[in-house]
């Protein structure tokens, strides 16, 4: 089973979604984790749109990447440009992969209403699902 870490800045939205999808789509192929370079808290809208898709991330918490420095990962996936630039060096021989997704909280801040805001989250959720579904090839 491959150990995979999804890394973004806040570990609040995109990396949380990716971890949730990996556990849902590939439970026998991936041991998935997520972390941030500057963690905050899990975004309630991310929890909501993942629940709509049948994935429960309500029990997740935001974690700093340093919590995983003693784990040997097979793959570290950065899901935002900032995390790619500041990816910790201690991941050693882990293969590194970058796939940038737009930031739903940033997109949602100009939304006219909650439904429009959630639309941004749903679109990114679905893009992350498509990406994670193909990750078993790596």
Where are the language model's segments positioned?
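Short glycine-rich anion-binding loops that position phosphate/pyrophosphate groups of nucleotides
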Residues: 12, 81-84
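Residues at the C-termini of beta-strands that transition into short coil/loop
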Residues: 36, 80, 100-102
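Conserved active-site segments centered on acidic
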Residues: 1-67
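Conserved acidic residues
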Residues: 74
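Short, charged/polar "capping" segments at the starts of alpha-helices
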Residues: 40-42, 83-86
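Phosphate-binding/catalytic loops
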Residues: 84-138
